[in-house]
Structures are given as structure tokens and as C-alpha cells.
Amino acid sequence: MTQLAIGKPAPLGAHYDGQGVNFTLFSAHAERVELCVFDANGQEHRYDLPGHSGDIWHGYLPDARPGLRYGYRVHGPWQPAEGHRFNPAKLLIDPCARQIDGEFKDNPLLHAGHNEPDYRDNAAIAPKCVVVVDHYDWEDDAPPRTPWGSTIIYEAHVKGLTYLHPEIPVEIRGTYKALGHPVMINYLKQLGITALELLPVAQFASEPRLQRMGLSNYWGYNPVAMFALHPAYACSPETALDEFRDAIKALHKAGIEVILDIVLNHSAELDLDGPLFSLRGIDNRSYYWIREDGDYHNWTGCGNTLNLSHPAVVDYASACLRYWVETCHVDGFRFDLAAVMGRTPEFRQDAPLFTAIQNCPVLSQVKLIAEPWDIAPGGYQVGNFPPLFAEWNDHFRDAARRFWLHYDLPLGAFAGRFAASSDVFKRNGRLPSAAINLVTAHDGFTLRDCVCFNHKHNEANGEENRDGTNNNYSNNHGKEGLGGSLDLVERRRDSIHALLTTLLLSQGTPMLLAGDEHGHSQHGNNNAYCQDNQLTWLDWSQASSGLTAFTAALIHLRKRIPALVENRWWEEGDGNVRWLNRYAQPLSTDEWQNGPKQLQILLSDRFLIAINATLEVTEIVLPAGEWHAIPPFAGEDNPVITAVWQGPAHGLCVFQR
């Protein structure tokens, strides 16, 4: 039998050099590591990794070729109280594997044991890693590098975005290929999108609990192989990587960036009762934050938390991010529960992973977006990330909903959020673009559901409606659910228009949830993470609706307003913004705090947003000049207005002079 040569300790993973494959694996506490390779008949062949350089185990298998299936058995102590859970009866996934063969099904054999080890061998049913070789012609691909001030983000799910699209070939709907189809690209261009932000595409697993209920993890925030593409989104698992890169190349040619939602905060191994796939059996003590009793710190709500202050885990995370940039040409990342990235265990701006990203010539040049919280004490860190990061601005989301959906909110608070939440983000040299403004996201109500439901309706998730937030700041306008009288439909439409206008014409970086521009509803489900069905798949029959045109017109209007695209903080007297009351006078201190919800926002001295968020028709005296409404607010008869605009109840209009 072929023997392993010692090989090299870097890079991590399995790498083919034309003559054989070099295998490397980190484990600081292992006593022995076996490489297990499987032939075409499924027969297992085991080799001890002969090289041991520091905490890196390595070996070189001559004559091995791409397509070889492999895994690891890692020997070491079973000492749960100390955080060690080695079990060589279990075949483990290489954390740096580029492709996985097999499914992560709920099976007792895929568990290591809780207090006592389960020594039943699982190689027959465990997923295997696959050695891949990387040859791809990027042609003249170049990143668009859209300036932050001009960036419009569109958050979408790979499958849900195109699975029901009637103009995309049936055989590629819901796949990576569909993202690069001309129909999809033309739609994004016409809408005005500059960056497509994809929910997780790294391989993930469905939680055993969901599988037992006949459900699946749809969103993908349960990662199992961070270097491997999720194969279900590919036309063929063997060509997934090229399909994905083809889509990115096509999007880049159209000037559209691709941002990946990435999950570095936890793994699909969940809590101690969860499955054993990889990290827990390779070096549980190093990869995870471990409590004094040997259990996990659950700062993510998912059962475990990756220890991103450990040097080896920092190297692993950094290598993963570089892989997606260098191999797939992605343009940035949105980091799920990103406060975990800064835990040491307390949150620090100079945490090891932040420092590694800052010092990396590759990662420091791409767009970085944080979901700036986790669920642990001290986990809410909005505004506290290092200067390279932009952050989801939940202050904006809540203020916009409260202002327009009949909750109390002073004008001053609304204006502060409209002005990129400078009280939160104007520090450490950060620019207004650091505020990622959103009204909705994958997590929560869709925009249509915000105006149709007062309460969540998550019964389909199998948790008796306990899951999902109860703090929605929504308003059903008098009737719970979709449909209703013409008057009800019109009032809901007006609220949607107001929320979209606030999102797309405010300072900061706007993020639009895919489907909001044509009224997608999840029927009140505000936590549809396990709904891989028509509840979450976008219905494109409404894509030519007036709402889509309204949204596109707003985006194109935004691009014409210097105060919004120059990405500079607004200062008193700089001509970027003036805040006026209904009489076109500067607001008094009392009006800012106690005045009616009536406001005029003059941008770049030429564009005026006139707002009447009260329940009464109100005369709004415009500033001096000849004003006319501009699309999408201009009607067929669009007379010049020189004095007064009749502001409808709960309405707004944008003018230009």
C-alpha cells in the first residue's frame, strides 16, 4: 500500500500539485491523526499523518488525484469536563474542504456521545470530503469597486430569488447559474442595484430538530463546511464552483458587486446534543469557547460559539475569507452575529480577527458589513466596530417604522436616523456609508407584511408561534392579513411608499430586501428560516407592478442627489441639508421634540422631501422657488408649485426646483 510522505504544513486543507495531494489539519490537542481515503467501491484506506509541525498534522499522498474522497479520524482524550471530545470512531470533515459528497442527515451515528463516547463507526454514512483542482478562466474580470456612496444593496436568497421566475429556464431556476442569467442581471440593472448580497452559500446542514419535523434550514445560517459551496444551489455538485464563478463574472460585467453573507460565529454541530461533523472531533477545546464545566458558551443562540480569538481559529477564518475573495472574486462580506468576531471574550475593536483583517492586503480592500450584535451580555455593539466595517443600522429600521406606522417618535429622532445616525457612526474617521440603512431584511417581516400584520404568524415553523421577535413596529391598518377594501389597500400602499422613500433617500447605505419592490408577503411569518416553499420564493408575477417602477425611480433619483452620493457628513450651512417645518422655516427646539409629524428636508438646495405623517390633510408651504414633483411622485398633470402643497394624510412628495 502507498505510504504517506511527510509533506508540508501549509496551506491547510487538501491540495493537488499534479503529482499527488498534500493534506494538512490543525489540532493542538490530538494525539494521532488518521487520513481516511475511500476508493470507488467505498472501501476505506487509513494512513497516519506522519508530519507534525507545531499544531499542524500533515502528510503527502503520491499519485492521489482530484475526485478522491477523504475524511479524518482524530485520536485524543475523551474528557468532556476539560472540553475534549475526541472519538476516532467518527469520520470527520476537513474544515477546509472545498467539496463535500453526501448529505448531513439526522442519524444517531453522526453523534459523538454526550457524557460517554459513542464508539459505533459511522464511515458508511458520514459525508466525505472531495479533493478538487482549481482551473478557471476569469478572462478580463475586474471587481466593480463601486464607491460606498453609490452603493445600493439588494439582499437575496440564491434559490428564492429565481426559483419561480418564468423567464429563466426551468432547469437552472433557483441555482447559481440563474444569478448570472441575462434576465436576472437586466432586472437588477433596471432596478438600479449595485451590489447583490446573498444569504449563505457555504455548505450548511439542516438541524436534526427540523429534519424530524419534515422541515429544512432554508436561510443557511448553520454552516458545516465554510470553504465549500452549498451543492443544492448548483445544477451539478461537481460544477458548483464554476457555476458560481460564472455568475459572479457575469454580474461583474454588468457592474454589480457580489457580497456574501458568511457565518463565522458558530457551526452546525450545535450544542452538546448536536451532531459531530468536524470541529468538535478535531479540537473542540481550540475551536469553541468552552465554559469551566466543559460545555459551550452559547453566545449565538445556536448552541456553540467559535473562538475567534484563538490564533489557529483566526487563521482558519482569515483563510476562509481570502478563499472567497481570491478564488471566487467576491466583493465583500456581511458577517452574521458579528460581535462574536470581536470577543476576547469581551468585545474589543482590536480583537485578533479584526486585526488580521485590517492587516490583510486582500481583505482590507473589500466591503465589510457587520450584523453588530450577538445574544451574550455586552453583545449589542452597534457603532462600535473598527473603521473598515459598515454596520446594519437597526436604529434606522425601528425609527422609520415607528415614524410612518403610527408609533410615537419625535421629529428630531427621525431626522437623526435620516442623517446616517451620526450620533452612532460619526467617530473614528467613519463616513455616513458605515450606516447600512434597512427597513426590512430576511430576518423579520417583509415590507408588505409590515403594513398588513400587527402580530407574527409563525405557526408553520413548528414552535407554536414562540419563535421570531414580537417587536415588529408594524401596523395592519385596521385588518389583520392580506387583502381588504380599496381604501385599506391604498393606505397600505401609501405606507409602503413612505417607507421606501425614507430608505432610499436617506443618508447612509440603503439595503433593500429582495421582493419588497413588488410586494412579496410571507403571510405574517417573521422568522421564515425553515420555509423552503412558496412562502419565501419570490412571486415574479408582480414584478412589473407599479411598486417595482416606484422603487426603481427612487433609486435612480437617489443617484442624482449629491448630498446622498458624496458620502460626507452633513454640516450646518454646507448646503447639503436644511430641515424645515410646514411653513418652510427652521424647526424650533420644541418642534423637534414635540411638534407634529410634518417636515421638509431640502437636499443639495434643489431636492425637497415634503412630509405629512399626520392623519389630516395639511397645507405645506414650500420654500421660495418654482417646484415640480419628480418621478415617482409626478403625475400626468405636473404643474409648477410656487407656494403650497396639499399634503395628504400620511403622505409625502419629492420636488425639484
From Swiss-Prot:
Q: What happens when the gene is disrupted?
A: Disruption of the gene leads to overproduction of glycogen containing short external chains.
Broad class of enzyme this protein falls into: hydrolase
UniProt EC number: 3.2.1.196
Q: Indicate whether Phosphoprotein appears among the record's keywords.
A: no
> What segment(s) does the record annotate as region Disordered?
458-479
What reaction is this protein's catalytic activity?
Answer: Hydrolysis of (1->6)-alpha-D-glucosidic linkages to branches with degrees of polymerization of three or four glucose residues in limit dextrin
Q: In which pathway does it act?
A: Glycan degradation; glycogen degradation
Modulation of this protein's activity: Inhibited by iodoacetate, p-chloromercuribenzoate, HgCl(2), cupric sulfate and ammonium sulfate.
The entry describes the temperature dependence as follows: Optimum temperature is 45-50 degrees Celsius.
Please name the GO terms of the biological process aspect recorded for this protein, alphabetically: DNA damage response; glycogen catabolic process
| Single GO MF descriptor | amylo-alpha-1,6-glucosidase activity
Give the record's subunit note: Monomer.
What does the sequence similarity comment in the record state about its family? Belongs to the glycosyl hydrolase 13 family.
- Protein name, UniProt field: Glycogen debranching enzyme
